[in-house]
Amino acid sequence: MSWQTYVDDHLMCDIEGHEGHRLTAAAIVGHDGSVWAQSATFPQFKPEEMNGIMTDFNEPGHLAPTGLHLGGTKYMVIQGEAGAVIRGKKGSGGITIKKTGQALVFGIYEEPVTPGQCNMVVERLGDYLLEQGL
């Protein structure tokens, strides 16, 4: 299965039980910042934004004072799982990032998708990739 298929079929899919509700953008990005696959709507990010995200996984709390930036959009960092998941909020939407052994799985959402639904979609794929040694 190609990385693009993971994004299209496992991240940008309808959310279980909520036909027509889906993430607004998603991607799988290597730890080095290289894009493995992304939705057409995923923002163009700057290398320093990805560096900040990777630093926060290695030093939890790093982004809390400044916020998480992706594609020029600032998200307020909310509770995550140290070293494993970063979550951010902006207005009625937000972002979930799950770290695997080799990649970061990104999901960006807006209402009517809820933070919990985004977390479920992103973390389910991230956990699967971890189980596969990726």
Curated annotation (Swiss-Prot):
Transmembrane regions: none
Molecular function GO labels: actin monomer binding
Superkingdom of origin organism: Eukaryota
CDD domains found in the cross-reference section: PROF
SS bonds (residue pairs): C13-C118
Entry PTM: Phosphorylated by MAP kinases.
Phosphothreonine modification, residue list: T114
Keyword terms: Actin-binding, Allergen, Cytoplasm, Cytoskeleton, Disulfide bond, Phosphoprotein
Protein location: Cytoplasm, Cytoskeleton
One cellular-component annotation, GO: cytoskeleton
InterPro entries: PFN, PFN_euk, PFN_sf, Profilin_CS
Principal place of residence: cytoplasm
Motif (Involved in PIP2 interaction): 84-100
Family statement drawn from the similarity comment of this UniProt entry: Belongs to the profilin family.
Function text: Binds to actin and affects the structure of the cytoskeleton. At high concentrations, profilin prevents the polymerization of actin, whereas it enhances it at low concentrations.
Record note on quaternary structure: Occurs in many kinds of cells as a complex with monomeric actin in a 1:1 ratio.
Additional facts recorded: The variability of the residues taking part of IgE-binding epitopes might be responsible of the difference in cross-reactivity among olive pollen cultivars, and between distantly related pollen species, leading to a variable range of allergy reactions among atopic patients.
Protein name: Profilin-3
Organism: Olea europaea (Common olive)
